[in-house]
């Protein structure tokens, strides 16, 4: 989850960074595998390259949310460690998804550097590295949470979110399948389903669900909160689709390729809804082609249809609805958690 504004304080960030080193060292000395020096160095470099480098907003959100739920300005040492550890599990999950997503999307850059599979000597070893990253999560959870009453709920939560995210990725991939390009399949319902499952659950619901479990809560009692966070995640992904086309690549850390990749983007769905027959013909002839001239024609059509203004209206209406839904929640602490998420992403530029 990209965010600006008021994130975690310096003390929280320092603790978060310190705990990363502890978790990584545990993984590098895991007695379940006899590492050679070469394999240990590979894992060390691979984890740093892929888990670090982002803004860590998903992970830090666990700590911030836990504090708000407890009504505490500061957490005890063990509470901080456990919250940060769950936060890092989400960052590891994000790394796992991104390593594999970049291979499937044939991407070039991620977080301002080459995608891991494009690093010399890595290539498709990155696919196995992704599997290792996912397995690290299970090992971290077992080491630090096995004795907790909510351990089984944590495992279920991560497994459920991973399944939903992978299913969303599948829907995204088969909808944009090479050789079967058919823009008539693209509509707001298909787009909504993809982003709900591909992004919203792991980016928005998972951090808050982790904080709720740490607080001793039963997730079955928070269906409304799940729905609000999924809506927020949808809004976030629409922002992402918008920034893919209109954001500054140097500022957002990646070069947008949704048009070239034939993505079921919010922008193309909006264009299809608004275009006349001649404009639709331009989309059908140019969308999903690598040729810069074709990309330019699509972007020019977006400008003709004034999709920037359409997005601004969508953003404002989404914000109003989310605020109303949040303020309908009976728990003030839960309201604070949800508002903290919303304020981090509202009007973001990266």
From Swiss-Prot:
Q: Which residues bind dimethylallyl diphosphate?
A: 110, 198-199, 237, 254, 263
**Cellular localisation:** Cytoplasm
Q: Which Pfam families does the UniProt entry name for this protein?
A: polyprenyl_synt
Sorted UniProt keywords: Cholesterol biosynthesis, Cholesterol metabolism, Cytoplasm, Isoprene biosynthesis, Lipid biosynthesis, Lipid metabolism, Magnesium, Metal-binding, Steroid biosynthesis, Steroid metabolism, Sterol biosynthesis, Sterol metabolism, Transferase
The reaction(s) catalysed by this protein are:
isopentenyl diphosphate + dimethylallyl diphosphate = (2E)-geranyl diphosphate + diphosphate; isopentenyl diphosphate + (2E)-geranyl diphosphate = (2E,6E)-farnesyl diphosphate + diphosphate
**SUPFAM superfamilies in the record:** Terpenoid synthases
Which residues are involved in binding isopentenyl diphosphate?
55, 58, 94, 111
Where does this protein hold Mg(2+) 2?
101, 105
Give the family this protein belongs to, as stated in its UniProt record.
Belongs to the FPP/GGPP synthase family.
**Protein name as it appears in the record:** Farnesyl pyrophosphate synthase
What is the gene name?
Answer: FPS
């Amino acid at each position: 989850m990209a965010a600006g504004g008021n994130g975690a304080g310096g003390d929280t960030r320092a603790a978060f960074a310190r705990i990363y080193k502890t978790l990584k060292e545990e993984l590098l000395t895991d007695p379940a595998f006899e590492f050679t020096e070469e394999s240990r160095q590979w894992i060390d470099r691979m984890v740093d390259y892929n888990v670090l480098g982002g803004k860590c907003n998903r992970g830090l959100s666990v700590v911030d949310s836990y504090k708000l739920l407890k009504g505490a300005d500061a957490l005890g040492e063990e509470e901080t460690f456990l919250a940060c550890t769950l936060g890092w599990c989400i960052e590891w999950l994000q790394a796992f998804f991104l390593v594999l997503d970049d291979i499937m999307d044939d991407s070039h850059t991620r977080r301002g550097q080459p995608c891991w599979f494009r690093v010399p000597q890595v290539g498709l070893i990155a696919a196995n590295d992704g599997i290792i990253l996912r397995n690290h999560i299970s090992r971290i959870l077992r080491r630090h949470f096995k004795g907790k009453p909510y351990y089984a709920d944590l495992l279920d939560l991560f497994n459920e979110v991973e399944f939903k995210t992978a299913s969303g990725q599948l829907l995204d991939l088969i909808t944009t399948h090479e050789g079967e390009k058919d823009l008539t399949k693209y509509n707001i319902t298909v787009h909504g389903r993809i982003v709900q499952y591909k992004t919203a659950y792991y980016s928005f619901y998972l951090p808050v669900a982790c904080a709720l479990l740490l607080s001793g809560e039963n997730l079955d009692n928070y269906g409304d909160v799940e729905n609000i966070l999924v809506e927020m995640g949808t809004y976030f992904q629409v922002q992402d689709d918008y920034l893919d086309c209109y954001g500054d690549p140097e500022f957002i850390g990646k070069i947008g390729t949704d048009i070239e990749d034939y993505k079921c983007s919010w922008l193309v769905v909006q264009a299809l809804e608004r275009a006349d027959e001649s404009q639709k013909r331009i989309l059908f002839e140019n969308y999903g082609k690598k040729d810069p001239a074709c990309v330019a024609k699509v972007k020019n059509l977006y400008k003709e249809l004034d999709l920037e203004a359409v997005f601004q209206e969508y953003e404002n209406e989404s914000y109003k609805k989310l605020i109303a839904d949040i303020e309908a929640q009976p728990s003030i602490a839960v309201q604070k958690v949800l508002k903290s998420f919303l304020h981090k992403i509202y009007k973001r530029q990266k």
